Amino acid sequence: MKIKTAEFVISNSKVDHCPNSTLPEYAFIGRSNVGKSSLINMLTGRKSLAKTSAKPGKTQLINHFLINNNWHLVDLPGYGYAQVSKSTKKVFQKFITAYFKKREQMICAFVLIDSRHKPQPIDMEFMQWLGEHNIPFCIIFTKADKLKPKILDKNIENYKNEMLESWVEMPEYFITSATSKLGQDDILDYIEGINNSI
């Protein structure tokens, strides 16, 4: 898939205010500072479609982007160590879970994992929650360019082993680098394949 157009549509904190559309949606979510904004900009070929920040927890709203006029890319708030108050975190969690439970247009969630780190409990718990609620998801390993190939392979293998303790099989996953554009075609082709089948 080639991205010809990518337009910001709306930001909001309530699922009921999301676009009144039947277009398929693909949600991107992960721990704070996982490289989500950089990945979205890489996928769309736009340098500043999603705002990047060195400060974790910058994305605090549900952001919809219209891609090629036929699907929505949804940028969700990061979870984890976002530098926000506990009460704000609860609000995040509430509308994130509401989005996944209520938004029928949501076809697949892409859970971003920093490939440099060992499996994190918060990531495992979130994916477990998705599974328990029958929400389709894939894993995107980010920042692959920061590691030597052998270490990258080892880290991903660790994740596979961890996942297979609770899951029958490893979910679909992609290895990416916003710097080298590694994984760009694979993810976009995956989305295109789903769009063509629905």
UniProtKB/Swiss-Prot annotation:
This protein's name: Probable GTP-binding protein EngB
Gene3D superfamilies in UniProt: P-loop containing nucleotide triphosphate hydrolases (3.40.50.300)
Cofactor(s) this protein cannot do without: Mg(2+)
Keywords recorded for this protein, A-Z: Cell cycle, Cell division, GTP-binding, Magnesium, Metal-binding, Nucleotide-binding, Septation
Residues engaged in binding GTP: 30-37, 57-61, 75-78, 142-145, 175-178
EngB-type G domain segment(s): 22-197
Species name: Christiangramia forsetii (strain DSM 17595 / CGMCC 1.15422 / KT0803) (Gramella forsetii)
PANTHER family per record: ENGB-TYPE G DOMAIN-CONTAINING PROTEIN (PTHR11649:SF13), MSS1/TRME-RELATED GTP-BINDING PROTEIN (PTHR11649)
Family: Belongs to the TRAFAC class TrmE-Era-EngA-EngB-Septin-like GTPase superfamily. EngB GTPase family.
Binding-site residues for Mg(2+), renumbered to this chain: S37, T59
Gene Ontology terms: biological process: division septum assembly
Pfam families tied to this protein: MMR_HSR1
Function: Necessary for normal cell division and for the maintenance of normal septation.
Classification via InterPro entries: G_ENGB_dom (IPR030393), GTP-bd (IPR006073), GTP-bd_ribosome_bio_YsxC (IPR019987), P-loop_NTPase (IPR027417)
Single GO term (MF): metal ion binding
